[in-house]
Amino acid sequence: MVESKTPPRTHKLTDPPDANYRREVWQDFRTCCLSREASVIARREVLTGRANFGIIGDGKEVAQVALARAWRKGDFRAGYYRDQTLIFALGLSTLEEFFAQLYGDPYGDPFSGGRQMNCHFATPLVDAEGRWTDHKNRYNITADIAPTAGQMARGLGLAFASKKYRENPAIGGDFSTNGDEISFVTIGDASTSEGAFWETMNAAGVLQVPLAVSVWDDGYGISVPKKFQTTKESISAALAGMQTTGDDTGIEIYTGKAWDYPALCRLYREGVEKMRSTHRPALFHIQEVTQQLGHSTSGDHRRYKSPERLAFEEEFDCNRRMAEWMIAAGLATSEEIETIKTEARKEAGEAAQRAYRGYHDRVAALRSELIACLQAVQIAHADVPALGQIQQGLEEKREPLRTELVQTARRAAWALRKKDSAAKTRLAVFIEAEMSEGDRLYSHYLMSATPNSALQVPVVEALYTDESTIKDGYEVLNACFDHNFATRPNLYAFGEDVGQIGDVNQGLRGMQQKYGTGRIFDTGIREWTIMGQAIGMAMRGLRPIAEIQYLDYLLYGLAPLSDDLCTLRWRSNNQQAAPAIIRTRGHRLVGVWHAGSPMGMMLGSLRGMWICVPRNMTQAAGMYNTLLQSDDPAIVVEVLNGYRLKERLPINIGSFTVPLGVPEVLRTGAEVTLITYGASVRVADDACALLAQQGIAVELIDVQTLLPFDLPQICLASLKKTNRVLFLDEDFEGGASAYMLQHVLEKQGGYRYLDAPPRTLFAKPHRTGYGQDGDYHSKPQVEDVCEAVYELLREAGLA
């Protein structure tokens, strides 16, 4: 039986010390004791080999129960792996669920389904069908990530969503109550040295959003003391220049002691209530935090802390200090304190044992099933002595992991690879079932599988008439965005130079003037937090289009996309989604910093969002229309040198869609298949025209999206016809051209149809040189394509 979760807070600690006040204090102290015992047990379980890794929140218990009292339904958290006490205090986890995550139990871990290590929490923001849950009537925990300060930018986005909902309460629905929701962020003091922290605090001060950042200051970053981490050895002192002076700018700064329970309750209550009305961000610098059990189970803090520091940590243990205050205030006797601690120790121990047995009892049942399979194959194949050794190895494991069962079964199958019997078939069925279950447990939900998936959006062809006008490419985008802003009140666009001038290439020209500064707006030069704004907004039901001005600058915003946005649905086990659209432009133009096409980097780091590479602005518009109907995140890389090229404007510019993962055959031919995307399409098309003059018919395919890639296998169908293939792009060697080659030849089986070695054509290994001359000698040109195609044919004696 799973124990009940902690009841939600119903009583503020503002009363005189009557029975209600005493009961609430006792509840908080009991939560602190339960959390401490959970930490002690978690460390022991790892060090004795019963769990893999433990990172815990000892020493922060009192500050976190005080913080919990400032919460209201509808609030959000973007925290990190020290917040177990807060989660217990809010009633969002039982001890058994906490330990199930520690043991890596995918069935018992409600936060990540066994995908994340312990102390990484999440609550459902969407249901299994992708429908939004009621955010405003529950406590909302966004799925944790471990990269230090990685939660900061998401927290900014969550707070910014409150600002948007306050500006337009009509779209609040189940998401917001007048934008009153606070975004609570927690971070360790040493992690405030990260650039993401400073970028977030500056952005929060500029934007004036309800971001409440609690810094747990225990004096160290693992073993490195804060004198090497923070100017003045104090993050509140270092941030003093941002502190508000009473006007509508800056941030509030509060300080408190981690062991002073009544003062912390008052600090958080007053600070947070003020924030709900003003929307001014605040830093809560919680000092003199201790860490009784060290940083994690991978080390011992006695190696780097002085005897004096260790003595301080014992004396100022927050739980001990709270107990002393309760006794001095007449709220409890020393005997009652000991009883609470003893009961907490017992309750935590029993919960840990239930969680441990919950995992291993399931494995034990599978173990019995596997042993029966092994016994059967030994009878059927007595001439395979390895089977007995394999079974013996399994039986010697007292409490094997599920993986060890699968390994054992597969090794037995390997020993039987040349045999055949009903017993072997039974073993194969066991293996197939467990491999399938493992795939379900750990590999599903990278992308949306809901009815709202981008892959389920109906295809609507672009329509043209004889009167269809010819426009510059940017005007096509302009018309698309205009339609979507008119019909989607929760749609926003922002980035550097996006607002007043309508982006540097005019795709949003006039949109701010038409739809207001609240929906289309400029940001500072801060790519990390622009991405964070998009992530947090999208998690709260808004539809952001966030701009990275040039693809070359994606590196500044890559970490939050890769670590946070791309992993969100997967790491929350399909409980959370953020359908953010990242808009950027790239490929060839002039110079090192405006001609990037790092698609290989993106393919390696952005699994979990779609990568769209339209060849022109009409295709880009159709992709935006598709994505805005879906619940998947995506990045759209527009062609930087294509905004002034002429295109026909579809009459259904706001409603036609381009399906993701479906290439388009732009030229038909029977001699060579040429596969490319983005800006290289125009290069390839010009080359095909030259080749056609020589009687060489090339089949030109624009893949349109790299993720997903060619779902209907159009490239393979072409290769079956031509038997020769050239992959073209302007990434470096081994980048997207190699990726496309692997998909077509290996995954689609295209190698079977080759009459000549496959070719890739890519950029030089250096960055792009300046001007037309630099571009010509850095990236593939029309002449390079012609020569590569001719060489393919010449080698076959066809040219």
Label each residue range with its predicted role:
Residues R44-T48, R131-T142, G179-S183, W216-G221, ...:
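Gly-rich Lys/Arg/Thr-decorated short loops/hinges at beta-loop-alpha junctions or inter-strand turns
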Residues G79-Y81, A149, T186-I187, S214-D217, ...:
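Short beta-strand segments
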Residues Q576, G586-V590, H594, M599, ...:
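Active-site phosphate/pyrophosphate-binding segments
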Residues M1-A63, R69-A70, Q291-G294, S298-Y515, ...:
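Conserved acidic/glycine
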Residues E37-S214, G219, P225-Q243, R540, ...:
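Cofactor-binding active-site loop characterized by glycine-rich and histidine/acidic residues
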Residues R23-V25, F29, R50-A51, R72-F76, ...:
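Short coil/turn connectors at secondary-structure junctions
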Residues E61-V62, N140-R398, E404-L405, Y492, G510, ...:
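Thiamine diphosphate
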